[in-house]
């Protein structure tokens, strides 16, 4: 073995040995590198997780704070809101009961909804307006009020469909009332002529000479 070969063997110790002895050393070196890399990655992950936890503790969530403030406001103002709502409902109910009491021919124990009371009250007001002759429905009136006829509560209740149909002017009540009113006007116009016939007969009898004078 020459001096050059000996120097190369010293520089590269694995070359002069058998492959069975060189492989365990290589495997041990790779395992050391892997363990070092895994330790570094674990340290980095622990540091990042610790920083995230610390940030989450120091910086509160704005949504959570807002929700808590809203919940506190609701819990504090809920009794006042509930009392205000109860008083509003009570006042509204008393007003509707008073309006129902003013409607004619409605028994006090009759159960009517708010919409029923409003329809009956509107139709009754329209009937009174037409009866007094202060203001007749014209083209400026809404179509709902133009077609209104007075609806008797006992005749139309509890037939809700006919109640609202009559209030809207879609039922046969409007045609019957119109025909009855037209017939009454015709009779009123023909009344003086019929009543004037007996007076004319009496006047002719008085003007004719009596048979005893001849």
UniProtKB/Swiss-Prot annotation:
Residues 73-87 have a biased composition (Basic and acidic residues). InterPro entries: bHLH_dom, E-box_TF_Regulators, HLH_DNA-bd_sf. One of its GO terms (cellular component) is nucleus. Disulfide bonds: none annotated. Keywords: Developmental protein, Differentiation, Myogenesis, Nucleus. Residues 1-87, 175-214 are annotated as: Disordered. It is found in: Nucleus. GO terms for biological process: cell differentiation; developmental process; muscle organ development; regulation of transcription by RNA polymerase II. GO terms for molecular function: DNA-binding transcription factor activity, RNA polymerase II-specific; protein dimerization activity; RNA polymerase II transcription regulatory region sequence-specific DNA binding. Residues 48-59, 203-214 have a biased composition (Polar residues). Residues 76-128 form the bHLH domain. Forms inactive heterodimeric complexes with TCF3. Both the bHLH region and the C-terminal portion are essential for inhibitory function. Inhibits E-box-mediated binding and transactivation of bHLH factors. Inhibitory effect is similar to that of ID proteins. Inhibits the formation of TCF3 and MYOD1 homodimers and heterodimers. Lacks DNA binding activity. Seems to play a role in the inhibition of myogenesis. This is Transcription factor 23. The gene is TCF23.
